[in-house]
């Protein structure tokens, strides 16, 4: 069940849903607006000939922070990682779904490629997969609204929430745009 604004506020007030920093003006009818942090991960196109999800490629991306007061410019066809300004902590009975903002989508900005689902038990900043599909550069301002997080109540609490030893939670506690750790659980079929 999708939580309404009053349910979202009740979960936050009770301390079950953690959002830091929390700004009540970001609560929408059935979602919470999320803001863009100031750190980005850009791909180093000259370090590798290709991306291999089975291998650890430590120098695949570099962390970039724009000069204070300046935006990050995302060029047409470019893909970078960003993250939410807010740190989210979900209880074992709520899952999240990150969606883009309609106004930004109409400018050609995609907020996430595939990873819009947030497991119950997750705690950390949400990594954003930012793409510019427009034919002009888009400026990304730290602190701007970048997406919205919908919360879904599970039918029962998760038996093994994200962060538990059984869940294999490789992104638990992440801060800033976190590169892929796909090699940690990559499986090849034989």
UniProtKB/Swiss-Prot annotation:
One of its GO terms (molecular function) is nucleotide binding. Its EC number is 3.5.4.30. The active site is at 129 (proton donor/acceptor). Residues 171-190 have a biased composition (Polar residues). It catalyses: dCTP + 2 H2O = dUMP + NH4(+) + diphosphate. One of its GO terms (biological process) is nucleobase-containing small molecule interconversion. InterPro entries: dCTP_deaminase, dUTPase-like_sf, dUTPase_trimeric. Keywords: Hydrolase, Nucleotide metabolism, Nucleotide-binding. It is an enzyme of class 3 (hydrolase). The record marks 116-117 as: Important for bifunctional activity. Residues 160-190 are annotated as: Disordered. Gene3D superfamilies: 2.70.40.10. The keyword Nucleotide-binding applies. Pathway: Pyrimidine metabolism; dUMP biosynthesis; dUMP from dCTP: step 1/1. Homotrimer. Belongs to the dCTP deaminase family. Bifunctional enzyme that catalyzes both the deamination of dCTP to dUTP and the hydrolysis of dUTP to dUMP without releasing the toxic dUTP intermediate. This is dCTP deaminase, dUMP-forming. It comes from Mycobacterium bovis (strain ATCC BAA-935 / AF2122/97). The lineage of its organism: Bacteria, Bacillati, Actinomycetota, Actinomycetes, Mycobacteriales.
